[in-house]
Amino acid sequence: MDNYTYSELLKSLQNKCDNIALIIKPEKVKQKLERIEKEQEDPNFWQDVLKARDTNKEKVRLNRLLETYQKTKNALDESVELFEIAQNDNDEVTLSLLYEEAPILEHGVQKVEIEIMLSGEHDASNAIITIQPGAGGTESQDWASILYRMYLRWAERRGFKSEILDYQDGEEAGIKGVAFIIKGENAYGYLKNESGVHRLVRISPFDANAKRHTSFASVQISPELDDDIDIEIDEKDVRYDYYRASGAGGQHVNKTESAVRITHFPTGIVVQCQNDRSQHKNKASALKMLKSKLYELELEKQQSTAKNEEKSEIGWGHQIRSYVLAPYQQVKDARSNIAYSNVEAILDGDIDAILEGVLIAKA
């Protein structure tokens, strides 16, 4: 990097910061936080538990947004000032340090942009994830299990919790399907764009001839809805099936039919849950999954971007990302059009850069 390149970078970041300020209006955010704090001082504030909870969530979000913006703006202003002084003094050491820290400065501005993008109605919610292998038997089932592990590792890296709702072992390897919840701040906001078909190209570990194989798996993301959000489901539109459950890996086979499968006829959505020994609890969890999926479907219709991954054959259509392990190593996202070479790290859950790249591309 040289002086001209760094100078242009600073101008670009300053423009972005100015645009961010126009969007979030920091002074108005401060005023809103002051109003919330006054509301919380009122002894009657906590009588409406749901309203108090929502207000507190908003307070946390606004505080985080303001702090992230202010920290980034201060760092940018300081860099601009230091750059000007270092140029005037021909201070090569300071200039070199500024060049080295340029990516950190860029990431800081990007972080504020991401905070703005995670302000949707349910972005702060937990995420319900369903993974289904495509055609191809063992190959696709193994790929589905690799994706499952990738998301679990991502959750671990962020300090999030996960809970299995349904798990079906593959015939030889991998999984026939899995549904689980990732619980953490903005889990749904970060993962909402993961819905779609994920494609894997690799030398098959199950092929004695070591041929290259292409596998597909479908991922669907929906927000875990709060209990106060009312989604009407007509009983005549659903069928309940009860069956014996087994845990991940085939452990804890139940002697009673505690697992629950719900089929919603109007949409064709099927959900199932077997994580608990109680049929009643599994039914409640399955209903929550169904409501979340129906809500997500309605949201997509309203936005005129309805996706049909679940209704279409999982194959070449509706792909959002390709993971190539052979003959070269690369992960490429179709929305951001960005390619990544750290494939091993990505499959181990290091997907923040991909998720953020898609959020920015879709902004």
From Swiss-Prot:
The keyword NADP does not apply. Transmembrane segments: none annotated. It is found in: Cytoplasm. PROSITE patterns: RF_PROK_I. InterPro entries: PCRF, Pep_chain_release_fac_I, Pep_chain_release_fac_I_sf, PrfB. Pfam families: PCRF (PF03462), RF-1 (PF00472). One of its GO terms (molecular function) is translation release factor activity, codon specific. Methylated by PrmC. Methylation increases the termination efficiency of RF2. Its main location: cytoplasm. The modification N5-methylglutamine is found at Q251. GO terms for cellular component: cytoplasm. Keywords: Cytoplasm, Methylation, Protein biosynthesis. Belongs to the prokaryotic/mitochondrial release factor family. HAMAP family: Rel_fac_2 (MF_00094). NCBIfam families: prfB. Peptide chain release factor 2 directs the termination of translation in response to the peptide chain termination codons UGA and UAA. This is Peptide chain release factor 2. It comes from Helicobacter acinonychis (strain Sheeba).
